Every structure is written in structure tokens, then in C-alpha cells.
């Protein structure tokens, strides 16, 4: 039996073993569809990754449009900042470092590609159409039609493994360091043996920010079989001056066969070439590190070493099974279960670990640090402070604590809390001071095992530093006037005022929890300054000049669909009208009472002013719960939005997943509660979508260990008739974090008609 057939047999036996394992107990990972979000700008990818993995192997198919017509690689085109789009049909390799559900291009580098025949170095020449895709947590496979090559990939947290099923004849494994999603260039590659290369690729400039802080990702790559030929290619830039007369390689790609010294350049790559007499399997193992080549090699050896593909896949899938089993769903609706677990899967990708196997990592100041715990990165905090961290405080408190401690380490290293941090680089993307909100919210939910005094000091620094404040531009005017004007050059002055208010409220909450009464009073008063921007003529928040005059002409609709406008960031006046979650009762009074409040909310939903695909207004469906007798509108609207935007299909997200925030919104809607007010440990109810859900909580933080959520959802009713908590009638549509976590059972009676 040849090696090709033997490998196929091993893979088949492995699949049978996993299938037997699934039949003995219900597996959670079988309900994950990694293709959800790969269309409709969801920016996810179906590649292989471990929970919180630093490395992932994703198919790279963004060099051609859906019709196969050649186009330039437009990384920011229509916000498609992802290595994979479901509609595209032309694959140019498998990238080893990626982001999931973000709105700007970066990473997407260290791209491998199996080919046959003559070696070609241009991805548009060697790329291939593909078919028979399969994806599950920790695994992806595809057939390359051009070459008749089946490819399978799997990954650990810091290393990955690809398996290429080559036909007989000339076959190649390419490693392209020129292609990628990052806006940075530059790479190094060196053969250290006939079967091993090492090198680096520069990345950075996320959202075209912090370009001066571009940094390397190091790698080591090994093939399982020694090639007949190996080498490096380098494409040279084109010169038009006199020197071009003597350059025979001007603008050409130069092949360097058996070259064993380092090659440096912008468009370089390496190849392993074989001449197989029969079909043969070649495995490629890659380890990465942001610290050094030596650490990349150690990560590879420690996490994969001599393990075979099947062992690595099963190890990672066991890790996913453990991660996703925090929630157990009992329902006959298989489709809804797949939507839910796919969301929990996507939410478990970022933030991801940033430290190597030995604990080394790159600090925010560029020095090498060491951690005995876990160092996390990819903090998309403008997005995640609204619902994401509350979910992980509940389901995965140890992970949330490590995230908080990572934020405090960033403060120690850089002098500031993170805003939108990526691989120890502050990108300063979006607005506001969101880390303060996450720190306070985590502490108020009982996760207090971090240095709260340091956190409070860090929070106050960003709120009180008047000069050279990178987190709060315009703070001096904000403190003097109570708002940011359109005259001082701060982006989205209305939106940013609101964000500063929410952060100030969080600081006040933290101050109160720590016993600082005067500071609590000060910050809570400061958090209400958005009222200076409330215009009763429109019942909306409106931009103002520094002299106190309203900005005119004022068009409340301007700014939808990412259109730039004077007052708001990624939204318009309607989408920011209710974004004061800490003062909803006060806003009701400003708007003239409950009837006008509900009327204005209905205006948003009834006239297509609501944007499900972005963060500022995603809590709005739950705001009807603040008005007695109108709670049914929340239940109706959440149900409609779930059905409209969340599907078990590639376009099954409303838009960019924003590192799991949109998935978190869906999960809360299906579970029946939502954290409507960041930095307040409360939830508000809606109708659950499953008959029974068990939340398996960490007993180190939640002694009861389990919460059961029961309902008669399968009978078709979507309106809450009654709620019971531990057998007693519960008369409020709000529940504190403490009461929810101490409950053993929450039961909903649902009906077909609203209870008004």
C-alpha cells in the first residue's frame, strides 16, 4: 500500500472514530458552520483555528471577483478586509495569520500553496478554482480543480499543519511572502535545511494607522519529505533610470535555486519541488511567533512536534468541544442550534493569545516581556464593551480576567489603557475611552481578582489628562463645555461626547464600588453632559458650535451607511439618539415622557433608520422594556431581527462581526436576556428561542455551577406571558447579574399574543 492510500485510510478511520465518539454523546462542534459570515461583509473565514489561537490557516481567495475576472487586490474594497469571501471562486493559497470579523485589512500573510508542473511565482498564474469545501472547528479542506490536489489544514494555538495530496508527477509547495492583506511590505526567508525554512514578514498599519509601528511576524516552516529541488524567488522592482540599462533582471523575478543564505525583499517566496512516481502526501508544518524565529520553532515543536495530522485535529477539536460546551441546548430546531453555536465559535476567536509557548511576548513599548498567565490581544473595544465582555464574564470568567489583566499590562507598558489594540500596537481606531467601561463592568459583575486600584488610576488618567491625551482628543473642551463642538477638529463630536459620557459613568461606578464617594458623584454628574446636545425641536442629539449655537443646516438622516457627516461616527442622529444607556430614565424625561420616547423609538424601526450592522444602536430593540406595557415590542423586534439577519448560511450575519459582537447580540437574543447598560450589572429580558438551555458556569466564580433557562418556545409563541425565577413569579423585565447567576432556573411562559 503506497503512502497516499495509507494516509487516506488513516483519515477515514479517524473520521469513523470521531463519528463513533459523536454517537456516544452529542457533540457540540457538529453544530458549528464556519462559513457563516463569509458573505454579506461578515469578514469571517472558514479556516482552521484553535480557541483563542494566535495562528489560523485560512483559504485566501480575494484576488479575483466572483466571475473569475482578474482584478487588483483591493483590501479595503467595500470593507472586505478578510482573506476569504464566499462568492469568490479563485484560491491563491492558505494564509497563516488572520483576523476575524474586523473592518480594516491587516495580517493575511505567510501564504502556502500546493501546485503541479512548472513553478510559477505570480499568484494570478498559479491560483486555482476549487470545489468540495468542508469546514468545522479546527479543520478545513478543499480540492484544487486546476491541479487535482486535495488540501486539508488544521491548527493549534501557535502552529498549523497542512496536508497536500499530490498526484504523480512534478509537484510543488510554494511559500509566498509577498502576498497578503497587510498594507506593510518586507520579508526575509532562509533555508536552514532541505526541508525547513525560517523567516519573517512585516505587518501592521491597521486601518492605515500607526504605520511607524510596523512589526514582524516570525515563522518556521517544515515539509515532511525532502524535495528534489528547492529555492527562493525574488521579484525586483522596475527601474527607468540609467541603471536599468545594465540590469538584466530589471522588473523580473529571479530564481535562486539551492540558495541557503537569507533573502530579503518585498516580493519574495520559497519553493519545495518534487517529482513523484505515484500519488504522495506531503505535510507542511508552520510555527509562528511575534518574538523571534527561535520561539516560532519552539512553538512548532512543543505544540505539534511529531504529532500527525489526525492527532492535531482531534486535539484542537477537543479544545473546541470544551469551549463551546459552556452552553448546552436542548431543541429539535437544528438550524437554530447551528446559528447559535457558530456565533459562540466566532466569539471565541478574538481576543486571542499573544504570548509564545514559553510565555514570551512583545510588550506595547516594543520590549520583550514574559507572562506566567496569558497575554491577550485584538481588543476591538469600541465594539466589545457593549455586550461581548459581559457574555464572557458570565460564561468564561477566567478568560475575561486574563483579558482584563492584559489591558492593565498594556497600561503598565505604554502608560495608557488600550483603545483598539492589535498585537501590542495601539491603532487608535474608533472613538471614546472604552477600556474604562470594560474594567468597571467586569469588576461590578464580581470578577474582582485584579488590581482594582491600578485600574481606577488608569481610568482616571485618560479622563483627566488635558494635554497630549491619545484616548480622549478634545478633552479640555469636553470638560469646560460639557460637549465637543464641531469647531475643534474632533471626529464625530456628538458621538464622541456620548462615548466619553459612558466612560465617565463607568469611572463613577468604579469609584463608588471602591468607596470614593466624591469622585463617584463627580463622574456621574459629568456623564450626563450629553444633555447639552439635546435639541427638543428634533428630540435628537444635535451638533453644536463652540459658541453654543446649533450646527446648521442639520439633516438627521445624513451619516447612514458609513456616509461621513459632521456630528457622528459611523452613523447618524437617529442611530445615536438613544445611545446613553446609563441615563435612559433621564432621556425619557428629556424627550417629554414615555409616549414620546416610544414614538421616537418606533420612528427608528418603522422608517428603516435602525442599523443592525453597527454598534451604536444595537441595544435599541431592548429599550422598549423601560416603558411598562411596551415590553412586547422588544420581544417582537428582537424576534424579527434574529429571523431577518441571522441564518445558517454564508450571509448569516448582519454585517461585519466586529470580533464577535454581532454574534454575541444573536446569542443573547436566543437565550432571552441582554446586558442593556454597560458598567451596570443588569440584564433585560426578551423571549428565548429554545425550550431548554443550560449555562455551565465556572464554579470558582459561580457556586451553583448551572443556570437552566426553560420555555415553551417550540410551540411558536414569541411573547412573554410570565417569568419565574426558581419557581417564583418574577415581575420585572430587568434582572441583576447577581440574581441571574444565583438562580438555578429561569422559566418563561410564551404565547402568541402580546401581554400589554
What residue spans do the PLM features occupy?
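Bacterial Sec-dependent N-terminal signal peptides
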Residues: 1-23
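Accessory carbohydrate-recognition regions in carbohydrate-active enzymes
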Residues: 21-437, 443-498, 509-532, 538-575, ...
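ATP-dependent phospho-/nucleotidyl transfer catalytic cores
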Residues: 503
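Short aromatic-glycine motifs in intrinsically disordered, low-complexity regions
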Residues: 706-715
